[in-house]
Amino acid sequence: MSLQAIIEAAFERRAEITPKTVDAETRAAIEEVIEGLDSGKYRVAEKIDGEWVTHQWLKKAVLLSFRINDNQIIDGAETKYYDKVALKFADYTEERFAQEGFRVVPSATVRKGAYISKNCVLMPSYVNIGAYVGEGTMVDTWATVGSCAQIGKNVHLSGGVGIGGVLEPLQANPTIIGDNCFIGARSEVVEGVIVEDGCVISMGVFIGQSTRIYDRETGEIHYGRVPAGSVVVSGSLPSKCGKYSLYCAVIVKKVDAKTLGKVGINELLRTIEE
């Protein structure tokens, strides 16, 4: 059986799988997928012919990984943890950090099965299993990258940003942030929403699948997708009865030179000398 076939078959009988009952073939397949996600060999979602495609079997492997492992003690800097998923950097040496070429500030936490690309900076933040963080991206203080979320190249996730995962509540597709995006402080993008390349999301914007994304220039309303190059702020739209207003996200304009100047990436913070 192929790796995918083993995972698909195991997922159908997931309720029966425990750390004591899992067979060797299934355990090996799940662990191979987690290692592949950890190294960047596999991605839960990727862009193919201009469209984002989710590889559901990889997401299923992530979910199955919680069925095959018992909780265990995990050593931290000043404390201990008790969890089923190991920490990504538990066995990293100085040489391996230098080779992979990203910076990790104290208190940043990355779970095994997440991939961090070269020239990334992880401030005290959290990156969950199955996530992919693209080259040159900054994950700022208290930002959270949810399970299986896909973060593009040269992205800035500002302080306190939340990028939703797929594990709980269970989501069909991961949340995706395209290349060269800026996500403002304390904003939340969840429920498999796709923010296309080159967008700027202002501070305190919340976007889920049911959030209306209103383009003030065209009057068009989008759901679940922010078009490429959009500048988005929080706002509201009137109800049909006109008695109250409901929250929405507003596309106020397309990214221009002035906007880029305000949110430009500081290469001095990214590049690690080889």
UniProtKB/Swiss-Prot annotation:
<dbReference type="GO" id="GO:0009089">
    <property type="term" value="P:lysine biosynthetic process via diaminopimelate"/>
</dbReference>
<keyword id="KW-0963">Cytoplasm</keyword>
<keyword id="KW-0220">Diaminopimelate biosynthesis</keyword>
<comment type="subunit">
    <text>Homotrimer.</text>
</comment>
<dbReference type="InterPro" id="IPR011004">
    <property type="entry name" value="Trimer_LpxA-like_sf"/>
</dbReference>
<keyword id="KW-0028">Amino-acid biosynthesis</keyword>
<dbReference type="GO" id="GO:0019877">
    <property type="term" value="P:diaminopimelate biosynthetic process"/>
</dbReference>
<protein>
    <recommendedName>
        <fullName>2,3,4,5-tetrahydropyridine-2,6-dicarboxylate N-succinyltransferase</fullName>
        <ecNumber>2.3.1.117</ecNumber>
    </recommendedName>
</protein>
<keyword id="KW-0457">Lysine biosynthesis</keyword>
<feature type="binding site">
    <location>
        <position position="103"/>
    </location>
    <ligand>
        <name>substrate</name>
    </ligand>
</feature>
<dbReference type="InterPro" id="IPR018357">
    <property type="entry name" value="Hexapep_transf_CS"/>
</dbReference>
<keyword id="KW-0808">Transferase</keyword>
<dbReference type="InterPro" id="IPR023180">
    <property type="entry name" value="THP_succinylTrfase_dom1"/>
</dbReference>
<feature type="binding site">
    <location>
        <position position="140"/>
    </location>
    <ligand>
        <name>substrate</name>
    </ligand>
</feature>
<dbReference type="GO" id="GO:0005737">
    <property type="term" value="C:cytoplasm"/>
</dbReference>
<dbReference type="InterPro" id="IPR005664">
    <property type="entry name" value="DapD_Trfase_Hexpep_rpt_fam"/>
</dbReference>
<comment type="similarity">
    <text>Belongs to the transferase hexapeptide repeat family.</text>
</comment>
<dbReference type="GO" id="GO:0016779">
    <property type="term" value="F:nucleotidyltransferase activity"/>
</dbReference>
<dbReference type="InterPro" id="IPR037133">
    <property type="entry name" value="THP_succinylTrfase_N_sf"/>
</dbReference>
<comment type="pathway">
    <text>Amino-acid biosynthesis; L-lysine biosynthesis via DAP pathway; LL-2,6-diaminopimelate from (S)-tetrahydrodipicolinate (succinylase route): step 1/3.</text>
</comment>
<dbReference type="Pfam" id="PF14602">
    <property type="entry name" value="Hexapep_2"/>
</dbReference>
<keyword id="KW-0012">Acyltransferase</keyword>
<dbReference type="Pfam" id="PF14805">
    <property type="entry name" value="THDPS_N_2"/>
</dbReference>
<dbReference type="InterPro" id="IPR001451">
    <property type="entry name" value="Hexapep"/>
</dbReference>
<dbReference type="GO" id="GO:0008666">
    <property type="term" value="F:2,3,4,5-tetrahydropyridine-2,6-dicarboxylate N-succinyltransferase activity"/>
</dbReference>
<keyword id="KW-0677">Repeat</keyword>
